[in-house]
Amino acid sequence: MVLAMLGALHPRAGLSLFALYLVLAAALLRPQPLRPQRAVPEEFSAPLELSAPLSGLVDDYGVRPKHPWPRGPRPLLSRAQQRKRDGPDMAEYYYDSRL
């Protein structure tokens, strides 16, 4: 419709737009080449097992993550700086008090 309106106004512009339309239609209707079924060749596939065992949990940058649990026993009285005569800390007995 637009081509017809442009052709009515300027015959050469309508003809060049029609030629452009034909080129685009031919390019879009041309069959696309089929993609290969396997994107990665067989010689590049990774082995199923690691050749060497992991020496530790290390991320991509070589940094070992910090674990939330401390190493060794936790001294409860020295951590809270309590004395035995102060009585037990009731917040430590209920696991849902810190949530």
UniProtKB/Swiss-Prot annotation:
GO terms for cellular component: endoplasmic reticulum membrane. It is a single-pass type II membrane protein. The keyword Magnesium does not apply. It is found in: Endoplasmic reticulum membrane. GO terms for molecular function: protein-macromolecule adaptor activity. The keyword Membrane applies. Residues 64-90 are annotated as: Disordered. GO terms for biological process: fusion of sperm to egg plasma membrane involved in single fertilization; gene expression; maintenance of protein localization in endoplasmic reticulum; protein N-linked glycosylation; protein stabilization; protein ubiquitination; protein-containing complex assembly; sperm-egg recognition. InterPro entries: Frey. Pfam families: Frey (PF15878). Keywords: Endoplasmic reticulum, Membrane, Transmembrane, Transmembrane helix. The chain crosses the membrane at residues 13-29. Interacts with SPPL2C (via active sites); the interaction stabilizes FREY1 protein and inhibits SPPL2C proteolytic activity. Interacts with IZUMO1; the interaction retains IZUMO1 at the endoplasmic reticulum membrane and coordinates IZUMO1 complex assembly. Key regulator for male fertility expressed transiently in round spermatids where it recruits IZUMO1 at the endoplasmic reticulum (ER) membrane and coordinates the oolemmal binding multimeric complex (IZUMO1 complex) assembly. Upon complete assembly of the IZUMO1 complex, its ER retention is released, facilitating IZUMO1 complex export to the acrosome. Through the interaction with SPPL2C, inhibits its intramembrane protease activity directly accessing the catalytic center of an I-CLiP. This is Protein Frey.
